[in-house]
Amino acid sequence: EAFQGEVYMNLHTIDKADVENEAKIINFNSTDIELPPNKIPTLTRDFRATEKMNIFQLFSHSHEKTVEFRVEIAGGNRDGELLYISYDWEHPPVMKFDPPLVVKRGETIRLKATYDNWTDETVTFGLRSTDEMMILFGAYYAD
């Protein structure tokens, strides 16, 4: 049975002269997900910063088989530095950073997700909660 929903949004504007920084969206994701049956695999994906990122918000998106979602710096002096972690796929924390978390141009952000595929089927990327995802959303501004 079809139903119609409604969504409302309030947009607040300011004068262009009052803008200090223009926010950009973080959308780091991987569709290359293949979880073998009855296993607990950890997948990693790396994303290199193409500009200096002053990150002021991060949150993960994944589905029901996710048991841990970590975001770290990979390589260099900050190797292994934890930026974000979630153990709750349904209600991931939205982390806000003030002052912003700085990731320099050329540094690598690593997504590391651990899944528990308790089923007898291989699970892949997909839109249903019984499929899986590995996405990092957030917001930043560049210098």
What positions do the PLM features span?
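Beta-strand-centric surfaces of beta-sandwich/beta-rich domains
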Residues: 1-143
